Amino acid sequence: MKSLKKQRRIQVIILATVALVLATGLIGYAMRDGINFFRAPSDIIAEPPQPSETFRIGGLVEDGTLVRGQGETVRFSVTDGGASVPVVFTGVLPDLFAENQGMIGTGRYVNGVFEASEILAKHDETYMPKEVMDALKEQGVYQAPES
């Protein structure tokens, strides 16, 4: 009788372990498209990502680079003070989007151009995303806003 209980306990433990491994694998598989890593322009130039990789880029919209094309296509460059990456975006830009202002874009880096699928602008005059602030500090061009 004891060996039957012991055998049942071992079966339950094995089944629970298999279920846990399977659940972890399914969660990881489901999240693979939902995780976007942040990169500064200097990081992209130093180590260009694969064209199939979706990630976020952040920095300042470089002065004098904002060009509105046909329809809703917009071209500009993003800089962190150390490097500059050209960006192309088709869609409606946020109201607060402007040259020399902070932005974060989501998209892919293809043939030396970041093809953005989404553009976010900073919220107000003093807000800057932490990732962008860190990248600008790393390049030595960050200026704290006047309070």
Swiss-Prot record:
Chief localisation class: membrane
Binding site for heme: H123, Y127
Keyword match Lyase: no
Cysteine disulfide links: none
One GO location term (cellular component): plasma membrane
Molecular functions per Gene Ontology: heme binding; metal ion binding
Keywords: Cell inner membrane, Cell membrane, Cytochrome c-type biogenesis, Heme, Iron, Membrane, Metal-binding, Signal-anchor, Transmembrane, Transmembrane helix
Residue spans, topological domain Cytoplasmic: 1-9
Membrane-topology descriptor: Single-pass type II membrane protein
Subcellular location per the Swiss-Prot or TrEMBL entry: Cell inner membrane
Pfam families: CcmE
SUPFAM superfamilies tied to this protein: Heme chaperone CcmE (SSF82093)
Regions crossing the membrane: 10-30
Signal peptide annotation: none
Single GO BP term: cytochrome complex assembly
Domain of life: Bacteria
Periplasmic side: 31-147
Stated family: Belongs to the CcmE/CycJ family.
Classification via HAMAP family: CcmE
Function: Heme chaperone required for the biogenesis of c-type cytochromes. Transiently binds heme delivered by CcmC and transfers the heme to apo-cytochromes in a process facilitated by CcmF and CcmH.
Protein name, entry field: Cytochrome c-type biogenesis protein CcmE 1
Organism of provenance: Ruegeria pomeroyi (strain ATCC 700808 / DSM 15171 / DSS-3)
